[in-house]
Amino acid sequence: DPADRRWRHAFINSTHCGPRYTLTRRLPYDRPQTSMAAFAMCPACRREYADPADRRFHAQPNACPACGPRLALRDAAGRPLAVADPIAETLARLQRGEIVAVKGLGGYHLACDATNAAAVARLRSRKNREEKPFAVMFANAASVAPYAEVNAAARALLEARERPVVLLPKRAGCDAALAGIAPGLAELGAMLPCTPIQFLLFHEAAGRPAGTD
């Protein structure tokens, strides 16, 4: 919803989702004991936090674009890059064949465009991973179907809250379209996005659709 104050907020969370263990510095699990201690809640977030009827009631990482962390894009040396929109710039770099470390819940994913054979080969070289298969992240279960067989059970696994990597039988043409991803294997490891940053990258690639488009 473009009218929502958290539209495209990369750190959105509630008591039902978002990081817990990975931002905890010590117990008890209260905001001052987490990496969110440096971010004071704005009045709107404070009202949500204090309202027992709100889904963000006592959500320790509660924040919004006005009071929470900010996205940043850095080069390989750790220097911040002056970009207007880190998500849009990251997508552009991936589409140009670059390799990007994308922050996850507890670490980083080294990501590249899986349809770019040269980028995949470069990632293999940097990881010293000559043959071990890579998993591919897709926007949704429907977007997996052209590359692998997705039955009802597989779809349920892909969409499970744990967001596992699911091994699926490859379709004809998969190896040509995703060259170098899973060489010599009959199955493709597929997964769906599970963090706001991952969702935002696919959302950006789709043209920032509103609602349920």
Regions found by a protein language model. Give the residues of each.
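Active-site-adjacent structural elements in enzyme catalytic cores
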Residues: 1-213
